[in-house]
Amino acid sequence: MSNKLKTFTNGIIKENPVLVLVLGTCPTIATSTSVLNALGMGLAATFVLLGSNIVISLLRNIIPNKVRIPCFIVVIAGFVSVVQLLLQAYVQSLYQSLGIFLPLIVVNCIILGRAEAYASKNKVLPSALDGVVMGLGFTFALVLMGFFRELLGAGTILSGYVNGVNGIAVPFFHSNPMVMMILPAGGFLMMGFILAAIQKIMARKED
């Protein structure tokens, strides 16, 4: 149990793929313009991580070493296709909002990295846990950035992309939006602020 708890805390906090390892910067910046956008991308990536880790772990003794990366990509692409079809069928607005970054999950360095570094070398249950934890860590980072970028850039929380969800307007920020925060430049700035804050907190804990 302690090992599972350690794996969970590592994926969410100590080894967060975005906030500590600084992986997946491109989709993080592009899809964290709002909370719901970020949540959708994070959950999609988590589903792909879980499914691909399980399948790759099951096939780890069958896949030839020389062609392992192409095989990993084929497996990951299968799960990404499932996600695309589901979103296109049931959450069309989110599907359109994520755009090209949804199919680009196939070559996301976080997912390929976990397939190569962990799933291909470990049993199914640990690989599944690793996929869930890393996916939740990615989702946490996206939602955190999405919250601040949406709040500062649009003055709302939980707006758009889901039918019946109109969002909550925060009066001061809604009247004085910092539009740059929902642009790519604002994404880089917000990511820098959050990374700096996390490094500061971690340095204090070490001291």
Which ranges hold each PLM region?
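Hydrophobic alpha-helical membrane-insertion segments
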Residues: 131-153
